[in-house]
């Protein structure tokens, strides 16, 4: 804040000058005392300068509505929306999200520093408050075949940027425990810069929680049970309750929250597809869900705003009080979280704002990122010994974790998908350098009866991942993604059914939100032609089957990976 702005705000606060904007006739939520106030809100230069009776150049009549702090998404990968930051903003602001803390490790895994710089530049083109955590694990594990590597020296210069809040989810727990030099340097650099460090403690024991806390890690969003949540809070951590497209943990973890410990909990979406953001919402959905599950509404709203702000040191976010930014929501129904207006930095979001994103032009260096070797159906064969059982990845709907099981395959020298037993073939294909590296395995739980689906969104290294009922359609889906520069596709009968092109790093569209949303709806409608009828997002579920830091069993370009043993294993024991 410059001196002139400081003086203007003091003048308005002290009544020596009129405030720029005054909101009257509203019920103000006091997140500190958990009570309602009936008074004016004075705003100048985008900040709240006073509560009380004020005169202003611009008067907003709240008409008896409730005024609450804007919502904060504590951990989100914007790339999972498949649109650029300005288009993402258009999806979440109407749902009351005024601030997000994002980890751009998806695009960084494909394009490294260039991808990180692209996201920082795009974030400046929107009114949404976008803060960044620097990707800590690119790639997610040392054996991963990502498109880039980010070491401590690559990240260090970014800490001088005001919008960078710290080091993003530290996933490589083996490197942390072993004190691997570059990981140690990343942790030390974040600490020296006075920044926060996010964790990623999926399925880890209390002993590992101790290790992470000793390393300075402050948060975890991978909690799936109340017991895990309390374990982390006891050790001084913040816990994020997550509700994304693939992982829906809010209901399961919420019983851990009470009046004594609530300040250590807040909400995040992590990964949520665009169509679900538009239709269902973001943090607003979690606040409403928490209230429906019996949490005190004041505490739910506090978790959606102030708690995240305090965790990340955002001193001017998360409350309706003097000294805080005028990021406000007008609410007509408190428990149903019915938002009528969203204000960011003192200006009402009209819904007609045009994106300033330069889309494909700005991303010119991130295009044409899908490089595939020549593949044939025999490259997809999995040799088996008929008498032996095979290892199977069992998916858990709406969770990121999987289970390792055994199953009896059909007779033959090679694995054949068994539709009656829902045993399908899964493939991870290297797509960054065009080398022929293909990991093959068997998965159960998708319920496809025909065809195949594939995507270049494949956490976190973002190679190409496909699942299908036959090799012909799997190969067709793979080839189609190469032709369109990445994205999502469905193949059946050797032909393309529907695709969504994501030419920016194989992760993002260069099209407006509305166009991408319609394409996604068409994609989800088309997948029913494969016989899919599951109550989960098949593409997002598929994309997380390649993340080898979430238990129990995942896939890489080298094949099946046992996360707990931290090693690759063959399809047949």
From Swiss-Prot:
Reaction catalysis annotation: adenine + H2O + H(+) = hypoxanthine + NH4(+)
The UniProt record lists the EC number as 3.5.4.2
Has UniProt tagged this entry with the keyword Hydrolase?
A: yes
Print the keywords alphabetically.
Answer: Hydrolase, Manganese
Q: What is one GO biological process annotated to this record?
A: adenine catabolic process
InterPro entries to which the protein is assigned, alphabetical: Adenine_deam, Adenine_deam_C, Amidohydro-rel, Metal-dep_hydrolase_composite, Metal_Hydrolase
Per the entry, which co-factors are needed? Mn(2+)
- Molecular-function GO terms, alphabetical: adenine deaminase activity
* Hydrolase keyword on record: yes
The UniProt entry's sequence similarity note says: Belongs to the metallo-dependent hydrolases superfamily. Adenine deaminase family.
The record's section on NCBIfam families has: ade (TIGR01178)
What this protein is called in its record is: Adenine deaminase
> What organism does the record attribute this protein to?
Bacillus licheniformis (strain ATCC 14580 / DSM 13 / JCM 2505 / CCUG 7422 / NBRC 12200 / NCIMB 9375 / NCTC 10341 / NRRL NRS-1264 / Gibson 46)
């Amino acid at each position: 804040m410059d001196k002139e702005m400081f003086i203007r705000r003091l003048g308005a606060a002290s009544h020596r000058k009129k405030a720029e904007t005054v909101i009257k006739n509203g019920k103000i939520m006091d997140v500190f005392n958990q009570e309602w106030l009936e008074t004016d809100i004075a705003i100048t230069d985008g900040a709240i300068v006073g509560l009380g009776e004020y005169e202003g150049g611009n008067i907003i009549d709240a008409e008896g509505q409730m005024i609450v702090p804007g919502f904060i998404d504590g951990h989100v990968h914007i790339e999972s929306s498949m649109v650029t930051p300005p288009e993402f903003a258009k999806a979440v602001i109407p749902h009351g999200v005024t601030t997000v803390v994002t980890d751009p490790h998806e695009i960084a895994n494909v394009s490294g520093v260039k991808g990180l710089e692209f996201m920082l530049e795009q974030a400046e083109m929107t009114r949404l408050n976008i803060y960044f955590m620097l990707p800590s694990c690119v790639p997610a594990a040392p054996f991963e075949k990502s498109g880039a590597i980010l070491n401590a020296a690559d990240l260090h210069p970014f800490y001088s940027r005001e919008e960078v809040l710290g080091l993003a989810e530290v996933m490589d727990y083996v490197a942390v425990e072993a004190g691997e030099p570059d990981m140690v340097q990343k942790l030390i650099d974040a600490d020296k810069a006075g920044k926060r460090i996010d964790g990623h403690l999926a399925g880890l024991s209390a002993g590992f929680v101790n290790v992470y806390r000793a390393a300075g890690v402050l948060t975890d969003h991978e909690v799936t049970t109340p017991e895990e949540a309390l374990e982390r809070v006891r050790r001084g951590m913040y816990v994020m309750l997550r509700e994304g497209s693939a992982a829906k943990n809010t209901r399961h973890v919420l019983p851990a929250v009470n009046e004594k410990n609530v300040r250590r909990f807040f909400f995040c979406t992590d990964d949520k597809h665009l169509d679900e953001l538009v239709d269902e919402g973001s943090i607003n959905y979690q606040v409403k869900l928490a209230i429906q599950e019996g949490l005190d509404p004041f505490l739910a709203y506090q978790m959606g705003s102030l708690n995240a702000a305090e965790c990340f040191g955002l001193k001017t976010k998360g409350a309706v009080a003097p000294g805080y930014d005028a990021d406000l929501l007008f609410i007509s129904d408190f428990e149903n979280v019915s938002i009528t207006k969203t204000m960011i930095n003192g200006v009402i979001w009209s819904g007609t704002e045009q994106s300033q994103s330069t889309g494909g032009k700005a991303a010119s260096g991130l295009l044409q990122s899908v490089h595939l070797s020549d593949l044939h159906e025999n490259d997809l064969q999995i040799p088996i010994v008929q008498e032996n059982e095979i290892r199977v990845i069992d998916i858990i709907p709406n969770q990121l974790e999987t289970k390792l099981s055994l199953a009896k395959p059909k007779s033959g020298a090679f694995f054949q998908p068994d539709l009656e037993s829902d045993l399908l073939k899964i493939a991870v294909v290297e797509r960054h350098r065009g080398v022929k590296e293909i990991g093959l395995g068997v998965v159960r739980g998708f319920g496809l009866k025909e065809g195949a689906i594939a995507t270049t969104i494949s956490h976190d290294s973002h190679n190409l991942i496909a699942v299908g009922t036959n090799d012909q359609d799997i190969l067709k889906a793979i080839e189609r993604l190469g032709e369109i520069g990445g994205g999502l596709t469905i193949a059946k009968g050797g032909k393309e059914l529907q695709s969504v092109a994501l030419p920016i790093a194989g992760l993002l569209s260069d099209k407006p939100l509305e166009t991408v949303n319609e394409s996604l709806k068409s994609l989800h409608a088309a997948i029913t032609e494969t016989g899919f009828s599951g109550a989960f997002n098949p593409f997002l579920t598929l994309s997380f089957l390649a993340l080898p830091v979430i238990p129990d069993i995942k896939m890489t370009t080298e094949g099946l990976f046992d996360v707990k043993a931290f090693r690759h294993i063959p399809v047949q024991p």
